[in-house]
Amino acid sequence: VHRRAFVTGTLAALSLGSCCSSAPAAPPVTPGDDRFAALAGMCDGLAPIGPDERARRRERAQALMQEHGFSAIFFEPGDSLVYFTGIRWGRSERPMLYLLPARGPGAVIAPAFESRTLRERAGEDLAQHLWQEHESPYERLAEALRATGVGGGKLGVDPWTRHFIVDGARAACEVEIAPATPVLRGCRTIKSASELALLRRANEATKAALRAVSAHVSEGMSEGELAGLVHAAQIAAGLTDTWALVLFGANASFPHGTRGEKRLARGELVLVDAGGALHDYQSDVTRTWPFGPVSSAQARAWQAVHRAQTAALAELRPGRSCEAADAAARAAIAAAGYGNDYGRFTHRLGHGIGLQTHEDPYLVRGNRDLLAPGMTMSDEPGVYLVGELGVRLEDIVAITEGEPEVFGPRAGSIEAPFG
């Protein structure tokens, strides 16, 4: 790959990426908000994933590569890089790639001027194949393949890798390139005891934060103001990278929100979908509760969603399909009189969770993948009545050998939404 072709392809990819809209900024929060002091220390006592566990992950990946016919896999900065190496690195137009062969140690392909920074973050033992600014990083990738004894075969790529990098690698390496999904999914969907502990605590912390915030909801406050409190409470509990979606009344009939911000009035439902990270592992919790008197329509919708969540839990057992839980929840919503299919339960039941808030496995019609112990996912049915209300309840669930484990208390009733 000539340097000119590399630069041209990179610029084209960046110009396409600039068209994407960015998420709204988090509302300002006041550090050390005394209202949430009781949450302090919730996330203490758990260590991040260490180098020994990451080494076992790489060994597992290599076994899966051999099983599925991959000579090597590579990926750029992101969750897979963190998962296997612990290296955190931002993506830019300059490729930084990690190569893991089916046998032997991995290597990194990086800009030469970043070499010392890489050694600080990854240690001295990681082999580096460095490229100067006028050179092609993909030639260095081909060089790294030869150095690790991979002269041909199938090269796996993380599905989240940008297209211009895949194109550059394909042209320079002259090998078959295929998605490394069987390897990455085979490693990341089954959580270790350490991962489960982090996910459990993160979700317990978000639930405690939402309970604490509910005591400070007041008439006339805006969705953004309440979101700020949710951020502050989660930070007080020890989470990082917090986020919050707050919707009042009819705005909650948009599952992921609407542009018009609303102020809270008595008699409306409050929907909060929130989360954060504990040592990179995510929480994702939704609660819906009333502010003031509860109408019969609100109570009926809330109860239907709670029953649907319970019906789905009964299907979250090892050996059952991902689509079975979605079907059970959808049947419960229909039985409550809210129509079949996607009419008022407009989205899939759930998604996997780990380093990413949304990852495999997905609980959706057509996904016949089988559940297995160690998988973690959301159980989040909803009912959305346009122009009137929205109700969603979401808990993170771990598949076990028997009954599923729900991380933190489930909602008890519309009057006791925090368990």
Regions found by a protein language model. Give the residues of each.
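Active-site neighborhoods and metal-handling regions in enzymes and metal-associated proteins
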Residues: 2-419
